[in-house]
């Protein structure tokens, strides 16, 4: 009995790749208005000026992104890992808004400390939830193994410490193991603006971040990859890649990875999501999509 091959194997075995791909094309005019895969971002109740590359900037993504602020959830409260019942309800409302009202494919956040609420966020939606790039650690560890190390860059390594047990439980990763190196950027000139909500000066901060990366690698030459935990670090990822030659993973890479699960291969996709996106983003500013009474309570002009 002859062996019957399907998929790409079948194409290579005798059907002819070109003909196979032609048959895989969706019918003309199938649905020109089909919705592109999109990202939902749960935002802190604070105002800062995101750089291109930051999760808070829609220009960081090549697909639609929608934002929803959580009234009352300040940076300090998020960092503590404890929400009041009122803020918890607002958190739930934000996720359900992104899921049901905007129909996003994946939900993430604009602060790495949202990892405190990874488990809770999953209760409110069936969509993939990745509150922090730390969720990538298990895959990175599996890919690199125990012979290499992963450097985890954060805004402040000291304030990240209390989240150790939550990360261990949610990600199955113990960053106290020798294969992880925690790196705080709190001493990088200009990066203190993150804590105060002030705009980051890209030209001022970039040399310090790159210098920090080189220093850490010099001290730990067996580092094989870098993970940016803070959502305001991705604007510097390209410079760190260029300076170190190492792969750098961050919140943008994390979002891209999970979005790709909803996007067909552009060579032979079936659902038209591979059609070019027109680049339109929903306009967003702090205070959008919240009730007037919440604006009065939590948003200052």
From Swiss-Prot:
Give the enzyme's EC designation. Answer: 4.4.1.3
The catalysed reaction is: S,S-dimethyl-beta-propiothetin = acrylate + dimethyl sulfide + H(+)
Its keywords, alphabetically, are: Lyase
What up-regulates or down-regulates this gene? Expressed at low level.
Top EC class, one word: lyase
Enumerate the InterPro entries for this protein: Asp/Glu_race
List each coiled-coil range: none
Per the record's keyword annotation, is Lyase included, yes or no? yes
Q: Does the keyword Lyase apply?
A: yes
Q: Where is the active site?
A: 111 (proton donor/acceptor), 230 (proton donor/acceptor)
One molecular function GO term is: racemase and epimerase activity, acting on amino acids and derivatives
Q: What other comment is given for this protein?
A: At least 10 million metric tons of volatile dimethyl sulfide (DMS) are released into the atmosphere annually by the dimethylsulfoniopropionate lyase in oceans. It is a component of the tangy aroma of the seaside and functions as a chemical attractant that guides various marine animals, such as sea birds, invertebrates, and some mammals, toward potential food supplies. DMS oxidation products act as condensation nuclei, causing water molecules to coalesce, with possible effects on local climate through enhanced cloud formation.
Q: How does it assemble?
A: Homotetramer.
User: According to its UniProt entry, what is the function of this protein?
Assistant: Mediates cleavage of dimethylsulfoniopropionate (DMSP) into dimethyl sulfide (DMS) and acrylate. DMS is the principal form by which sulfur is transported from oceans to the atmosphere and is a key component of the ocean sulfur cycle.
Please state which protein family the record places this protein in: Belongs to the aspartate/glutamate racemases family. ALMA1 subfamily.
Q: What protein name applies here? A: Dimethylsulfoniopropionate lyase
